[in-house]
Structures are given as C-alpha cells and as structure tokens.
C-alpha cells in the first residue's frame, strides 16, 4: 500500500508468446530513492529482526512469528504507514508485507522498531515469487493489494498485476473463506479488477450489488486518499472471498 498514486507494484507475471521464448513482464518499476536517517536505521537494525529472504522452500510462518495467528499478506506497502496502523490496531494478527522500494522498506522497519511491534515480517523482492515459493497453499486469511500501479496506457495494461494468473495464484494461497481485498483510485483499473475477478473461478464477490464494497473500516485512509477526496476523486474497494 502506498501514499502515492503509483506505488511500485510488487510482483511479476509471465506471458507466453508462441513465436518467442517465455519472458517475464514486471508490474513494478525499481525507482531509486535517497534514504533518510530513520529509513537507514530501519534497514540496519530492523532487517535482522523482521526481514525475510526469498527462499525456494515453503516457510514455516508459525515458527517465524512464534505463534499461530490469522495471517495477512500485503503486496506493495509503500512507505508502510497503513501497515503500521493495521498491525498496531490488530496485535492478534500477523502481517507479511512485501515492497521493492528500499526507502519504503526502511521506513516500515523503522516504524516497527519505534512502535515496538512484533507482528510484522518484511520481504523486499518480487511478491509473486514469495507467494509461489514461500507461502503454503491454503494458508492465508487475507491478501491486500492497495493502490497498485494502474499502468494507464493501453500498451502497458499487460503490466497490471491483476490478471487471471494472479487471481488463480492468490486463490491457491488463501484459505477457503479467505479474502482478497483490493483498492484503487483509478476507475478504469477498478473495472479491470472487477472483470478479472468476476471471471476467476473459486471466488465470491462480497459486494451486495456484485461490484464494489463500501470502504472497509479496517483499511486505513492514506494521505494521498484524503487529498483525493478533497479534490472529488473516488476510491474503489473490491473484496473477493475464496469459496472453492
């Protein structure tokens, strides 16, 4: 999740062209950024405590967190403000956050140290690779995707993270009854998300009208979102529950 309109999205999607070898299409852009003193402190002191490395093996998150608890996986937490707010408000839940932007990773880690929170673990890599290799099937209670890069231009739509392959990967990782919660401030992308998820097998749209849900109270409001509301911009939330 991010306080910017286009936070680096967080994963990769494979597309196949019969005339060419398979290649990887990234849905995120690695953006350089200077580290503040606090962000560097987070990386230096927080990463050894809360950071996780990509592995080829399924991870035992009960052992990593030292308990059994409902588990949320967040793709693209931006600067980590909303992650910190959610984790502080729900100490009985565990959060796994993934972000490729190093200043954002450092900011979240510094926040965890400052607030004394222990229910968050952090990856700094491709979120889809974490899902594929590190997360057991049917193990997540929620997956959060807040304000991913909408890739406005039509020729870039293939870079959007929400695609049929993504929907199926997430379905496998969610428990039955688990929920994929997405939010975007770009209406065409909201419609794209709705189309993809409505066609994906094994899900139920939790919206009463079969479209979008009211903003859930558990999703923190970002600075960017508040600014957008003052300007009359909309935000669309989608919740799809795994039913099969």
Swiss-Prot record:
Substrate binds at residues 153, 185, 222-225. Residues 1-20 are annotated as: Disordered. PROSITE patterns: SAM_MT_TRMB (PS51625). The keyword Ligase does not apply. Pfam families: Methyltransf_4. S-adenosyl-L-methionine binds at residues 74, 99, 126, 149. Keywords: Methyltransferase, S-adenosyl-L-methionine, Transferase, tRNA processing. GO terms for cellular component: tRNA methyltransferase complex. It catalyses: guanosine(46) in tRNA + S-adenosyl-L-methionine = N(7)-methylguanosine(46) in tRNA + S-adenosyl-L-homocysteine. Residues 1-10 have a biased composition (Polar residues). The active site is at 149. Pathway: tRNA modification; N(7)-methylguanine-tRNA biosynthesis. GO terms for molecular function: tRNA (guanine(46)-N7)-methyltransferase activity. Its EC number is 2.1.1.33. PANTHER family: 3-DEOXY-D-MANNO-OCTULOSONIC-ACID TRANSFERASE/TRNA GUANINE-N 7 - -METHYLTRANSFERASE, PENTACOTRIPEPTIDE-REPEAT REGION OF PRORP DOMAIN-CONTAINING PROTEIN. Belongs to the class I-like SAM-binding methyltransferase superfamily. TrmB family. Catalyzes the formation of N(7)-methylguanine at position 46 (m7G46) in tRNA. HAMAP family: tRNA_methyltr_TrmB. This is tRNA (guanine-N(7)-)-methyltransferase.
């Amino acid at each position: 999740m991010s306080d910017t309109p286009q936070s680096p999205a967080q994963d990769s999607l494979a597309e196949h062209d019969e005339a060419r070898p398979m290649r990887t299409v990234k849905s995120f852009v690695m953006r350089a950024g200077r580290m503040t003193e606090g962000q560097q402190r987070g990386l230096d002191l927080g990463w050894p405590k809360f950071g996780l490395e990509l592995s080829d093996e399924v991870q035992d998150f009960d052992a990593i967190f030292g308990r059994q608890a409902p588990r949320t996986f967040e793709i693209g937490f931006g600067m980590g403000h909303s992650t910190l707010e959610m984790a502080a408000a729900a100490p009985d839940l565990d959060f796994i956050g993934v972000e490729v932007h190093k200043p954002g990773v450092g900011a979240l880690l510094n926040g965890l140290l400052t607030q004394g929170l222990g229910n968050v673990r952090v990856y700094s890599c491709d979120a889809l690779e974490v899902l594929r290799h590190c997360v057991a099937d049917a193990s997540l209670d929620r997956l959060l995707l807040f304000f991913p890069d909408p890739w406005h231009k039509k020729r870039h739509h293939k870079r959007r993270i929400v695609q049929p392959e993504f929907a199926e990967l997430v379905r496998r990782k969610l428990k039955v009854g688990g929920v994929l919660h997405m939010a975007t401030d770009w209406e065409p992308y909201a419609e794209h998300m709705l189309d993809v998820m409505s066609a994906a097998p094994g899900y139920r749209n939790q919206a009463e009208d079969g479209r979008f849900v009211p903003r859930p109270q558990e999703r923190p409001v970002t600075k960017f979102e508040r600014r957008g509301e003052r300007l009359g911009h909309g935000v669309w939330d989608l919740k799809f529950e795994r039913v099969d």
